[in-house]
Amino acid sequence: DRVHPILHGLEVVDRRVLLLSIIGGFGTEDLARITGLHVDEVTHIIARVEPVVAAASRTGVLIIEDEPYMAELLSVLVEQTGHWVAGIAYTRDEAMTFAEKRDIGLILSDIDLGNDVCGWTVVHKIRETLGYRVPTIFITAHPERLEEDGCENRDGVVPKPFDIWRVREAVNNAVHLNASIFA
């Protein structure tokens, strides 16, 4: 039973209060009534999980890109957005290794990884392995391939050549959407 990294380490009651607060929009008194806890306990839980919520806005990004100079540029852009690079994978095997060993909150992936390897297939395998849906942005010279291949569950597509501001915006939008769902 795998837990999303943002929720990892929290007790069940902490998760319940956090999710009811963020997703349900319930206030402290309502949370106490719903959970059967005292208002002071709810207040204490919220104070304890606030660092988790703050950490959710900064995440590890896995870059899957077969061109080293492009991977390096993407890593600089990721760091400029305030996130950290969990790994740079040039191949499917490297991507799987990073995914299994690192906390990943976002994937930036090319579609054509060379040697007939499709980035969408790698991302799908990572999601299966981790047991949850990692937000993904495809940065590709072939955005039409996503439609042709029926690639769903993507959080953004940035066509190459790209504007650096568009990449930054896509990264922040995907991370903040994910944080609002899980934090």
Stretches with model-predicted labels:
Residues D110-D112:
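Active-site residues of response regulator receiver
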Residues I88-L106, E147:
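Acidic, metal-coordinating helix/loop segments flanking the phosphotransfer/catalytic sites
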